[in-house]
Amino acid sequence: MRRAALALALSVALAGCGLDVQSADLFLLTRSGQGKQLTLLVNDSGTIRCNGGKVRPLSDPLLLQARDLASTLDADVVSKLRFATSANSVFTYAVRLPDGTLRFPDTAGAHHTEIAQAEQFALQAAQQACGLSG
């Protein structure tokens, strides 16, 4: 009986310690090409780091979109989806995920919905969460 009470007290004490457990990064998106390079480090806790700056909050809709993108794009990495470079592209994207990195030109979104969604996420996150022009 005494051991059970001690175990219970210990587990309650540990639960209240506020262990500093950090959420995993969902992905690192880099956009390069004309204009300034953009980097977005998206964390599962609902934060984003823009161009190596300070951590900023990410809105719930953007966080849900980022989680969905991470899952979808990671499946593309696993299936070894590749894109040819295009002379018509303005930007090139690289998305680093747990299973590897997916690289694509901005023209790839015309044929792949998830790629168009990644490009849209980059624009919305840059404007809304980072306060950048996009």
PLM-predicted stretches and their roles:
Residues 1-6:
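Bacterial N-terminal signal peptides that target proteins for export
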Residues 42, 66, 93-95:
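Residue-level detector of buried hydrophobic side-chain packing
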Residues 13-16:
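C-terminal motif of bacterial Sec signal peptides marking the signal peptidase cleavage site
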Residues 54-85:
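Mature extracytoplasmic domains of secretory-pathway proteins
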